[in-house]
């Protein structure tokens, strides 16, 4: 049972798993901090989010729906939505999404730092920390960055849940008068 833990960490990078965890925690009103950590493709960046029931904003607030196509997309992504980023390995018979080891180390470090701040009581709100990476390999692969990447001036930004909360979020929107 998730409610028995002091902290939940999801470092799968899988939005479906993260959305399920968020839905479970929010629906059951579990007062357990959850840390989500994920990489962007080809070292383009990384994110760590601290979400706790009772604070503004939740993981579902990171997910948007394209008005034209109806497809879901990640509002936090540095990679422009609608692109195919899967690569195939010849002879391997499988596809994968390319991530670098360096970005994974940065994500792990940000995650540990976030957890330390949680247990020191340094966060009073939910938060997402986003770090821009190098776009060299990304652009050489013919991919395009998102407006979020282009508009983010600082290499690392921290955004409060009060700013990323979505008014019509099915899990946290109504409790904040939205």
Residue map of PLM features:
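Glycine-rich phosphate/adenylate-binding loop
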Residues: 3-7, 11-178
